[in-house]
UniProtKB/Swiss-Prot annotation:
Pfam families: Acid_phosphat_B (PF03767). It comes from Glycine max. SUPFAM superfamilies: HAD-like. The keyword Glycoprotein applies. Gene3D superfamilies: HAD superfamily/HAD-like (3.40.50.1000). This is Stem 31 kDa glycoprotein. Residues 21-35 form a propeptide. Accumulates in the stems of developing soybean seedlings. InterPro entries: Acid_phosphat_B-like (IPR005519), APS1/VSP (IPR014403), HAD-like_sf (IPR036412), HAD_sf (IPR023214), Veg_Stor_Prot (IPR011267). One of its GO terms (molecular function) is nutrient reservoir activity. Glycans are attached at residue 130. May function as somatic storage protein during early seedling development. Keywords: Glycoprotein, Seed storage protein, Signal, Storage protein.
């Protein structure tokens, strides 16, 4: 009996150094910790907080997030995120009975037309927004389509939904916006709503709420709203809609 106890104790002592030799106490903890790639981890968290609407009203992204944001925007993840959001919008729409007055509302900038070509020249959001420079870029009318939104747009049209574009662009951009939309493949819409410069609203959220109220008064039924900003999606007069938030970690519009 003593010999057996001694044998068990010896086995335990021999096995002890081996047990846990490759074991991670916190297997879900990032290996980077606070090392050289910590900015990548931090910026992924920043991006998540922006999309979850926990970080708001930021004027610029953190300086250390320029490269991670660039990698995200130009990599596969941004396209995949956009695809997933648009797919969910289509799945939702395809389950509904479509009426003649049913509309989907889309934003324009970085919702249907990509402004990434502008932001890649301005630090992916690390520079404060310059309205003059941005207007010059818009006036060129060369913004490409966001491909996953274009796919969804065509699918929604095929289901029988009417499309309304609702943007904070001013009315003086109507001609260039119409031309750019058509050039990018968005050929059909029920209404294109741009902002009257004489209309005073405290922010984009209030403006878009007011425009949705006008649409409801015209007899439309708002089924879905798709945008890259929370101000596209929140507020009053959303009708019966579900909202779908597209990714945009570069800037915030209140």
């Amino acid at each position: 009996m003593k010999l057996f106890v001694f044998f068990v104790a010896a086995v335990v002592l021999v096995a002890w150094p081996c047990h846990g030799a490759g074991y991670q106490r916190f297997p879900l903890r990032m290996k980077t910790g606070y090392g050289e790639r910590s900015s990548e981890v931090k910026c992924a968290s920043f991006r998540l907080a922006v999309e979850a609407h926990n970080i708001r009203a930021f004027k610029t992204i953190p300086e250390e997030c320029v490269e991670p944001t660039k990698d995200y925007i130009n990599g596969e993840q941004f396209r995949s995120d956009s695809k997933t959001v648009n797919q969910q919008a289509f799945f939702y729409a395809s389950e509904r009975e479509v009426h003649h007055n049913d509309i989907f509302i889309f934003g324009i900038d970085n919702t249907v037309l990509s402004n990434i070509p502008y932001y890649e020249k301005h630090g992916y959001g690390v520079e404060e927004f310059n309205e003059t420079l941005y207007d010059e870029w818009v006036n060129k009318g060369d913004a490409p389509a966001l491909p996953e939104t274009l796919k969804n747009y065509n699918k929604l049209l095929s289901l029988g939904f009417k499309i309304v574009f609702l943007s904070g662009r001013y009315l003086d951009k109507m001609a260039v916006t119409e031309a750019n939309l058509k050039k990018a493949g968005f050929h059909t819409w029920e209404q294109l709503i741009l902002k009257d410069p004489h209309l005073i609203t405290p922010n984009a959220l209030s403006y878009k709420s007011a425009m949705r109220e006008n649409l409801l008064r015209q007899g439309y039924r708002i089924v879905g709203i798709i945008g890259d900003q929370w101000s596209d999606l929140l507020g009053d007069h959303r009708g019966e809609s579900r909202t779908f938030k597209l990714p945009n970690p570069m800037y915030y519009i209140e």
